[in-house]
């Protein structure tokens, strides 16, 4: 029971918040309005927060260009709360068609920023940076609205369909978007992730006797770096590992992109292998720091 309570909001709290929300719904000049006071907001916010916690995979301390994963988490939970409240209000409004004409949130960028600033500890600069990143860019090749769900109607208005927030995988979409933008922070994150992968391999290789391990070693010319290499002294053989952090594909274009990433990685390994075979002593010296030996792999 305690485990279940840690994952889900008590039913009575959500039920009470839902009842208060429904009771507050009214129409002014044909537009829906409703309360988002603390007794309503906090209950739905906690539900959205628990959803994030139960599905999150990225370390909060990871930094992007102008914000961290922790900042993005606060932004997303707040905007998801707003979307959920708005969706419930439309469904329970009693208006024909569940008030479908009001289903899409339309506000100025300043209004969106202020709502999130009032409900979180984020600075307006961080909020604005995230909002700008998530605003749809039609010039971005093979873009998808799930990556950038805010749509600019004009310079003073942004439109947001709540289901694009509520039905998305925020961390995965964020990484995919940054990768698509070829942002420097993506490559920084890739290096961080590869470091985590190296640590995971270390937990295994650290238990194996008579091996040498090398990481992040540079090779001459245009050859790629060696991400991870293992020299087994008993069999006198070397394993070269090319580490790749690939975001799971969820569209045809991403499937092709992952195939290209894998082909590129295989090509890099092939180049390193050819160098190791043709210049074995030099390879061992550069990667493992060993002088020329008669007992080379």
Annotated model-derived regions:
Residues 1-297:
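Intrinsically disordered, low-complexity Ser/Thr/Pro/Gly-rich regulatory segments
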